[in-house]
Amino acid sequence: MGFLDRLKGLGGDDEDDAEQQARERDIARIESGSIPLAAEQRIRELVAGTAFTSGLSVADFALTRLEQIRPVCQVMGTSVYKVGWQNYPWSSGWGSDASLIELTALTNAWNDARARALGRLAEEASHAGSHAVVDVTFDNRRHEFLSDEIEVLVNGTAVHLPEGTGASNAPVLTDLSLPDYVLLRRAGYVPVGVVASTSVFYIVPSRQTRRMTTGWQRTQPNQELTDFTQGVYEARESALGRASAQARALGAGGLVGMSVEHHVAVREVEQNNQTREDLIVTFHIIGTAIAPSGEHRPLDPQTILRLGLGATKRP
């Protein structure tokens, strides 16, 4: 019941109790990793109707008709996650060497939030009775007004396939576009799942780097900041290692459609009347794990002959 309804005297305690019970039920479902009941009911109503929703372009939709793929509905998964307390490295003095450490609290927060969002996306797809979700997109956010919280939002289009699902009977998620997905199927491969990984590293610069990045020495000739370079490599390799481990767990033979996104934040630290600039490096890696499915299908190209001005004949 809304605030104006209360002012007008509409509704009652029974309605308030029902709303409170519904909220508590949804909170319990979310805490268990599921989706709110209203979202589940919306999906079931969409499936029961005759119309579908999708993020497909006109060309992509036309391709579904040619490939006997039926779009079902758009599905979504999200997770807003509070990051736990994270201890930052602290150098012992101006003359200390460089140090590099993974911020495990932040790394784990990103990976867990994304896993929860993908799980909810897959649950919506299951309620829709779909076999796969294509064109899965990720939106990773950190809000200025919630500095210790992150949000992961994933969207995709649930589709029904002529061959059904795989051995797991669960919808397969892929960030491939529909045309890429169709081409992959024709080549004798199938996606076995989305692979996603994040790593966050903290880099304390060495004495040499501090000299080159503070005070008058900023005007020195071009030089590589090798400890910062090493930190970026370490963060990338850590994220790639996790992604590769996920692919192996899915029984994949490779990863396609991979995207690598990275952010670098500067953190100023004052110590012993000196100021240094530390780096926080974040890598997000996303891709689709694939495996062979059998013999490839020929692409069967069409031949078009131009017989005159503006005339086209299809054999």
Where are these regions (language model features)?
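Short N-terminal signal/transit or membrane-insertion segments
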Residues: 2-17, 123-139
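Intrinsic disorder/low-complexity detector
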Residues: 2-106, 148-149, 154-228, 272-315
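A short linear-motif detector with a strong N-terminal bias
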Residues: 50-56, 112-113, 133-138, 171-176, ...
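Short, well-ordered alpha-helical segments
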Residues: 75, 80, 89-137, 215-262
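Short, well-structured alpha-helical patches and their helix-loop capping segments
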Residues: 109, 113, 144-150
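Short, conserved loop-to-beta-strand elements that form functional interface hotspots
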Residues: 132-144, 254-277, 281, 289-290, ...
